[in-house]
Amino acid sequence: MQNLRINNIKPVQEDFRGNGAIYHGYAGMPDDAGRVYTEEQCIIEAERAARMKLKIARTFYKWWAWDEKTNTWDWDNEIMTIFYKWLQRMKDGGVTVALNTGWCSPGDINSTWWNGKSPFTVEGDWEQSKQNYANWVSETVKQLIIKRGFTNIKIFVMFTEPQRYSGIFPEKTPYECWCEATAAAHNALVRDGLRDKIKLMGPNEGSTVTSEMLHWAAENAKEYLDIYSSHTYQFVAPTPKKYVTPGKYVIGMSIAGGRFCQTVNLKPNTNYVASVNLAAGVTEENPETVGSIYFGAFVDDGRNDVHTANGHGPSIPVAEGSTVAIDPNTISSDEFTKVTLKFNSGDATSCVIGVFHDIKCAGFSYCNLVELKEEGNDTNIAVNGDFSDKFNGWRTFVADGTIDAYDDWYTWAKTGLQYVPEGMPYCFDEYNVTFNRDNSHPSHGAEICNAAVALMNCGCQSSLLWTIFDQQWPNNHTYNNDSFVDGDHRCGVAPVLNRSLVPHLSYYAFTLLSRYIDGEGTKIYEGFGNDCLHTSMAVSPNGEITVTVVNCKEEVDEFTISFDKDLEGVNLNRHYFDPAICVPDEKAEIIGTDKVFENVTDTLSDKIPAYGVIVYTTMKD
């Protein structure tokens, strides 16, 4: 029995805008391979968004109105007309739209990134290019909101992950390029008397856990932004309990390129012994397609990294025999295997000790101990080599370790929130779990709802799941480990409709939060849980109460929620998601009420299934 608690006396957020999602307005757009939704499919997809009462849809948007052949703007061309239909469907469904006015900074302004040639670009003239971009931002308000009445467009997202190198920079830092473009857009809107028609959101920093650019933006762009935002993803699965020793952490990796390391000093011409405890599991046996796990002492070139500085692969060994490539099929997936190597440091006075996860198929690796010792000496040179102080002292990249992912989501969002100017809203503008790219897996619903509950509890004004549906990017044929399959970005809770009308299990979990937790004006009250069992409470402007409980583990759990303030005998309708009994079908209906808890006062007791999500609400179906 778990004891949960909700502080329903003082809200952590008094104006929650809802659990939204990235949902691009691609439905019906032309495609060079004919992968185009029919009108019926366009309607089905939009109706699903409306049925779940999706609060915010953030969409890709570019200079589709530009006619490159005539060098003129045509706001009624084929693509814009199709996009208007999507916007109208969103408006009819009560969905607020956030337009990404520019995706790549500065590449969309100076034509130096994957979106190609931009109509804003004046070769060699950043200032004029930037102004042309800003004029387009303002014209978008005139054409879409004022002239055509799409008043559900309420937010402009100022680029995507602009801290990255998304283009060739005009002798400026990524931060400066983004800030100058955002300032230009703000000033153009002010100039045209349109600033009150739209909110500017940024910087959309990601995928980082530190929100360093958000911190910078709060100090350098606060006069331009209405909503602050940043994000990250859960790259690593929660560590199974069988790997964990009480009082210590285990670091895990599941994406090729994941690694952790630290720089240490060496004595020249000294014999060393390096060892690592590893557990790993993969889905393939052929070493040529599986890849390897690299461990050892790598050259210190000033980067504090075990990844090569050029291309892909491990860095250079610091000495002969100082690194090893490990076939993951040769070590156990059930317990840790110790891998040891010996080397002489030669002329080296330092090295980078660490592990590089280069498993190319689906798989994982876990580590609970790294040691580097002089031969005959029992002192571990690696700082915090047993992870008793979590990962302090280690540089990590797509490598982490947690038993309860809720704690990570909460910490990541709090990190961003601490930098947001007082009284200003913060949106966690992308999230999902990426350690398993197949979103049909039974635990995905609980995993994303676990994140949503954490983001609500820490005080975010809104959050955006990447993405609500799988989506075919027009004229795109990308295949990569970021879930693109021939341009079909498979990140959603339902496949593209020309693959299947049947959604994933996670659709039925997420739609409960989306439908029964209201938007604008909703109050969020923080819940307190433990052992991967968490809760939160929302109260709508009209007084409707919704309590959410998520069990993000593989065991059934019983619980009692204690409310700090008596609920005064309300009746709560239960909506019960159990991935073991939920059967997805083409109807994609929201899970209805299966039980009513009558006269709820200061406690509520129930049982929740493994990876289950339960919503208790005063709302009627």
What are the residue ranges of the model-derived segments?
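Mature N-terminal, pre-catalytic/accessory segment of carbohydrate-active enzymes
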Residues: 1-47, 52, 355
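Carbohydrate-binding surface patches
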Residues: 529-570, 575, 611-617
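Substrate-binding cleft and catalytic face of glycoside hydrolase catalytic domains
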Residues: 49-240, 270, 281-287, 347, ...
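Aromatic/acidic polysaccharide-binding cleft in carbohydrate-active enzymes
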Residues: 428-534
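Glycoside hydrolase catalytic-domain groove-lining segments
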Residues: 236-241, 398-435
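C-terminal beta-strand-rich structural cap/linker in extracellular carbohydrate-active enzymes
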Residues: 592-621
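Extracellular and organelle-lumenal recognition/adhesion modules and their flexible linkers in secreted
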Residues: 238-407, 595
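Conserved, mostly hydrophobic/aromatic
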Residues: 21, 140, 156, 228, ...
